[in-house]
Amino acid sequence: MNTITLTARPEALTFAPEQSALIVVDMQNAYASQGGYLDLAGFDVSSTAPVIENIKTAVAAAREAGMTIVWFQNGWDSDYLEAGGPGSPNFHKSNALKTMRRCPELHGKLLAKGGWDYQLVDELTPLPGDIVLPKPRYSGFFNTPLDSMLRARNIRHLVFTGIATNVCVESTLRDGFFLEYFGVVLEDATHQAGPPFAQQAALFNIETFFGWVSDVQSFCDALSPEALARIA
């Protein structure tokens, strides 16, 4: 099986595309669009357009190279039973739930399955053969079949994109680390919830303790037809 070498920090990472997955975390209107949950909760989403384009580029490169592509959508049923009641810390810490309690007119609109907020942004569309998974909490490994689906495909390396770097991206990468997956995040294909230092802190944590950090151009270069031809 052919392997590629991806330029990354703190060191390059070598893996086989066929045993790797590109993870697209929560690229929903909720997190990337004006009028979505993050925007209504007071977070800045004005600079997400370049992130969307970079993810689109990464997805195309991964698909061409034969990588598995996994799309996550964060949210709950329209009655929010899956979100947990007052006995769940999620009830108290989810900014979506807190925003709806503060603005009752938004109830049933934020992160509710089937609604506009829950949908992936128009620019990013899964294709047949991609894996599309709902998730009820920050981590894509919690209460989802992600782990078993990856293991069935002998996938050990995960390349992360999406929003928010410091919340769902980092949470999923961390859980993957504990499950013996090698995780690398493409920093220019992610965006934080909060001020810029939240992005910097998340990338520092990942690079130093839990995984690797790269970028979309390096990812595309490693998967280019020329690079793949050299190792064929």
Curated annotation (Swiss-Prot):
GO terms for molecular function: hydrolase activity, acting on carbon-nitrogen (but not peptide) bonds, in linear amides. InterPro entries: Isochorismatase-like_dom, Isochorismatase-like_hydrls, Isochorismatase-like_sf, RutB. Keywords: Hydrolase. It catalyses: (Z)-3-ureidoacrylate + H2O + H(+) = (Z)-3-aminoacrylate + NH4(+) + CO2; (Z)-3-ureidoacrylate + H2O = (Z)-3-aminoacrylate + carbamate + H(+); (Z)-2-methylureidoacrylate + H2O + H(+) = (Z)-2-methylaminoacrylate + NH4(+) + CO2. GO terms for biological process: nitrogen utilization; uracil catabolic process. The active site is at D26, K135, C168. Its EC number is 3.5.1.110. It comes from the Bacteria. SUPFAM superfamilies: Isochorismatase-like hydrolases. CDD domains: cysteine_hydrolases. Belongs to the isochorismatase family. RutB subfamily. Hydrolyzes ureidoacrylate to form aminoacrylate and carbamate. The carbamate hydrolyzes spontaneously, thereby releasing one of the nitrogen atoms of the pyrimidine ring as ammonia and one of its carbon atoms as CO2. This is Ureidoacrylate amidohydrolase RutB. It comes from Cronobacter sakazakii (strain ATCC BAA-894) (Enterobacter sakazakii). The gene is rutB.
